[in-house]
């Protein structure tokens, strides 16, 4: 059984009973702001718009949507190259020491943009090895 809680831009779901998780997974979830019950108050996260392509073309998905009041994974005003993305991450990490997770969630499907996605993750891993990497497809 899972429990979902609403947040700006969607829902976060996790097992209703954390004892169902292995100790390794429970430790990782506790330090990840998307899955930890209290983590989103202590850790900062950043999503990088490096993946424009999507092979699904779902009717409900409008990846061209761009609104200054809309801030969630998959909505972006600009597209970054992998090199631009790692520069941006370094700038944010310097300004916000709580940054602990960097994710790629669009604006398309990261796995439909495998070269850009993996190059971005590779550069971040090389230059900022303490950050957790997240991929949402």
UniProtKB/Swiss-Prot annotation:
InterPro entries with a match to the protein in the record: Aldolase_TIM, MoaA_NifB_PqqE_Fe-S-bd_CS, rSAM
Positions that bind [4Fe-4S] cluster: 54, 58, 61
Domain Radical SAM core: 40-137
PROSITE patterns, per the entry: MOAA_NIFB_PQQE, RADICAL_SAM
Biological process per Gene Ontology, one example term: nitrogen fixation
Cofactor list: [4Fe-4S] cluster
Keywords assigned: 4Fe-4S, Iron, Iron-sulfur, Lyase, Metal-binding, Nitrogen fixation, S-adenosyl-L-methionine
Top-level taxon of origin: Bacteria
Family statement: Belongs to the radical SAM superfamily. NifB family.
Name under which the protein is recorded: FeMo cofactor biosynthesis protein NifB
Gene: nifB
């Amino acid at each position: 059984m899972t429990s979902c809680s609403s947040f700006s831009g969607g829902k976060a779901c996790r097992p209703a009973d954390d004892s169902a998780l292995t100790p390794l997974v429970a430790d990782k979830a506790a330090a990840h702001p998307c899955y930890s019950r209290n983590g989103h108050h202590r850790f900062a996260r950043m999503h990088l718009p490096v993946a424009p392509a999507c092979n699904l073309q779902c009717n409900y998905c409008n990846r061209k949507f761009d609104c200054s009041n809309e801030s969630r994974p998959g909505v972006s005003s600009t597209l970054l190259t992998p090199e631009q993305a790692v520069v941006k991450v370094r700038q944010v990490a310097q300004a916000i020491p709580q940054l602990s997770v960097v994710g790629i969630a669009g604006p398309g499907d990261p796995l439909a943009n495998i070269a850009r996605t993996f190059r971005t993750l590779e550069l971040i891993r090389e230059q900022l090895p303490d950050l957790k990497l997240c991929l949402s497809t």
